[in-house]
Each structure stands twice: as structure tokens, then as C-alpha cells.
UniProtKB/Swiss-Prot annotation:
Its EC number is 2.7.2.3. It comes from Lacticaseibacillus paracasei (strain ATCC 334 / BCRC 17002 / CCUG 31169 / CIP 107868 / KCTC 3260 / NRRL B-441) (Lactobacillus paracasei). This is Phosphoglycerate kinase. GO terms for cellular component: cytosol. Keywords: ATP-binding, Cytoplasm, Glycolysis, Kinase, Nucleotide-binding, Transferase. Disulfide bonds: none annotated. It catalyses: (2R)-3-phosphoglycerate + ATP = (2R)-3-phospho-glyceroyl phosphate + ADP. Monomer. Its main location: cytoplasm.
Length: 396
């Protein structure tokens, strides 16, 4: 269903509340990766260029104790945003009260204000993450319009997304949210064929909904990562010391029955005696020997997966093929990334931290059609679920 976009709103002279996703890694006040801040710039820039006042809300990490507040303040984020926008950004170290209200009332058209981490409200009874109705209503009262550009939290029903939206006459998606809905939505609902899904990661349980939703839609589903060996166990193969979810073996059997020859499992694996980069390792076909654990897909599988990708028109990749953070077990993930970067005339979509990190490490990120900013949110979207943060945005 088509949603209102920020460019559909008349923002001139308006106080525009924008829920952004500034949940960036920060250590000792230094931002490790500002991608999420950069991703929010088009929406913020649009509002201020069109004479609106941009009031930004975001969470940062999980705030469980008073001590967390010092580490999880949005102050460094506001400073970085100021550098990126090349203009002053007001930071207010409060999530409610007179200081915040006064600062908002002093804003001129084109000004930008960042208020403190919305999850500071979780210290007193999870008001933000529990979508406290009073908090949502209060935040909504601070603005005239609401724009949700935080796809990363769209699968959560929080006061700062659903709470504000339900107290506003008009809400819209930001440009980042629009892009996520377009690419992920097209992949799920209207993909160009051949449509290939590449799913990795440790657990079948994390990806089960995605696999079930994509089996009828995809032409091939390539499985890698630790979850491979739950499928191996379901086939009656030996898995050695490899990761296995025993309670998911029956489910894996059911999926294999449903998917038939659409499901491609690794035919060889890189195995080691210990979960360590320094452990002796080798490549084995099929069964995993006793005393060994599988930590990456092998060279024959890499070739099979690359062959399967040839001619693909839509590819969704979520999850690593092996223990990507250890160099000896990173090859599968890197080779799949290279193959994706080499595809011509295909819509390529990457989600998940490790897959995204691989794309950046390889320098193929510019060749990828869309890199999703939402981990859990993109997975739930691929599962075909309705995301509360998107459902709360006004329809066109």
C-alpha cells in the first residue's frame, strides 16, 4: 500500500518531528561508523530546505542503568550531524520538560534540533520501548507533523514511532524508509525472475520465517552458515561438532520437502577442530568428520552458488556463509559478495551486519542496488510480516 512520503507534506513554517535511526556504534564518545547518520541526511535536508524546523528523535543502544546514560548520549551524534549538514545543530540533553520545549519554541525555519536518546525514558518503566501512551502523546504535542525515517526500528512498536504517529493527523515516511519499502517490498511481492535468495547465519530459527515466505516466490534459495548443519542433521548426515539446533530438525525436514530442488545446501565445508582461526582446518565433502566443526562453505559450494547466481534478475542476501570475522573462514562470504558485485542487470539487496560488512570490505557496496539499514526489520519484512512502524504511517 502506498504511504505518504515527506515530499507529499507542506513542511514550511512547521515543526517536523523526524524519527531517525542514529543507533550508531560509539566508543569513548567517538562514532565508529556514521552510515546511519548519513542515510538520514536526505530527509533532514528536505525538511530544512523547504522551510521546516527539524526536531530529531532517535534511540541509541539499550539504556538499563543510570551509568549507561553517559555512554549513550546522542551529543556526539548531534556534533557529527552538524559537520555533515555544515550548519549548527542544537542538542538538548532532555527527552521532555521545559528545557526541551523552550529550545523547540526558539527554533527558526531551517533549524535542526536533536533531543536526547529516547531510551533514557526506559529507565523509569520502559516508557519508550513499551510504547507508553502518555509519552507518545507528549512527544506528538511538540510538533505539527511526524516523519518516520527509522526503518531499523519499524518492526518495533515504540513511543517514538507508533506512539507519536497515532497522535498525529498526518504522518509520512522519510526517503530512507521509502527506499527500504520499495526495494524489500518489490523483492517480496513482485520480484523479477530468476529470483535468488542467499541466506546464511548461525541459526535456522532466525531465518525460518524468511525461508517459508520465500519458498513459493524464489527460484533458488542458497543456504550457508551454521544453519546448514541443522539441515544436514535433518538429512541424516554426520555433522561432527558443528552447530545444530536439535529442536529445529523436524522443521528443517519440512522445509526441504516444501522447497524440493529450489533449496541448495553446501556440498563441501571448511572444517576445524576448534572454533578458532588458529586451529588446524581442511576442506571436506559432505559429512563432517567426528571431532571437527564446519566453519565455512567450501570451494565446490562457492562454485555451485556462483553458477546458481548467473543470470539472476533479483538477489536478496542476508547472513554470512561462515565465521566471517575469522580470516580462515571468511572466503565463502567474500566470494558470494564478489559474485553479487559482478552481476549485471540484477536488483541486488543486502541485509544484515556481516553481509553488509563483507560488501564494504570488498568495495562492492556502490555496485549493490540497496543495502538495508534494518537488521531485524528487514528480516521481518522478508518474512511477509506487517511492521508496526510502517503500518502507522498515513496512506496516500
Amino acid at each position: 500500500m502506498a504511504k505518504l512520503i515527506v515530499s507529499d507534506l507542506d513542511v514550511k513554517d512547521k515543526k517536523v518531528l523526524i524519527r531517525v535511526d542514529f543507533n550508531v556504534p560509539i566508543k569513548d564518545g567517538v562514532i565508529g561508523d556514521d552510515n546511519r547518520i548519513v542515510a538520514a541526511l536526505p530527509t533532514i535536508q528536505y525538511v530544512i530546505d523547504h522551510g521546516g524546523k527539524a526536531i530529531l528523535l532517535s534511540h541509541l543502544g539499550r539504556v538499563k542503568t543510570e551509568e549507561d546514560k553517559a555512554k549513550l548520549t546522542l551529543k556526539p551524534v548531534a556534533e557529527r550531524l552538524s559537520e555533515l549538514l555544515k550548519k549548527p545543530v542544537t542538542f538538548v540533553p532532555a527527552t521532555r520538560g521545559k528545557e526541551l520545549e523552550d529550545a523547540i519554541n526558539k527554533m527558526n525555519d531551517g533549524d535542526v534540533l536533536v533531543m536526547e536518546n529516547t531510551r533514557f525514558e526506559d529507565l523509569d518503566g520502559k516508557k519508550e520501548s513499551g510504547n507508553d501512551p502518555e509519552l507518545g502523546k507528549y512527544w506528538a504535542s511538540l510538533g505539527d507533523l511526524f516523519v518516520n525515517d527509522a526503518f531499523g526500528t519499524a518492526h518495533r512498536s515504540h513511543a517514538s514511532n507508533v506512539g507519536i504517529a497515532s497522535n498525529m493527523k498526518q504522518t509520512a515516511a522519510g526517503f530512507l524508509m521509502e527506499k527500504e519499502i520499495k526495494f524489500l517490498g518489490d523483492a517480496v511481492d513482485n520480484p523479477k525472475h530468476p529470483f535468488i535468495a542467499i541466506l546464511g547465519g548461525a541459526k535456522v530459527s532466525d531465518k525460518i520465517g524468511v525461508i517459508e515466505n520465500l519458498v513459493p516466490k524464489a527460484d533458488k534459495i542458497l543456504i550457508g552458515g551454521g544453519m546448514t548443519y541443522t539441515f544436514y542433521a535433518a538429512k541424516g548426515m554426520s555433522i561432527g561438532k558443528s552447530l545444530v539446533e536439535k529442536d529445529k530438525i523436524e522443521l528443517a525436514k519440512k522445509i526441504m520437502d516444501q522447497a524440493g530442488d529450489k533449496l541448495l545446501l553446501p556440498v563441501d565445508s571448511v572444517v576445524a577442530t576448534e572454533f578458532s582461526n588458529d586451529a588446524p582446518h581442511k576442506v571436506v565433502d559432505g559429512d563432517i568428520p567426528d571431532g571437527y566443526m564446519a566453519l565455512d562453505i567450501g570451494p565446490k559450494t562457492i562454485k555451485e552458488f556462483k553458477d546458481a547466481l548467473q543470470g539472476a534478475k533479483t538477489v536478496v542476501w542476508n547472513g554470512p556463509m561462515g565465521v566471517f570475522e575469522m580470516s580462515n573462514y571468511a572466503e565463502g562470504t567474500l566470494e558470494v559478495g564478489r559474485a553479487l558485485g559482478d552481476l549485471k542487470d540484477a536488483t541486488t539487496i543486502i541485509g544484515g551486519g556481516d553481509s553488509t560488512a563483507a560488501a564494504k570490505q570488498l568495495g562492492i557496496a556502490p555496485k549493490i542496488t540497496h543495502i538495508s539499514t534494518g537488521g531485524g526489520a528487514s528480516l521481518e519484512y522478508l518474512e511477509g510480516k506487517t511492521l508496526p512502524g510502517i503500518a502507522a504511517i498515513s496512506d496516500k
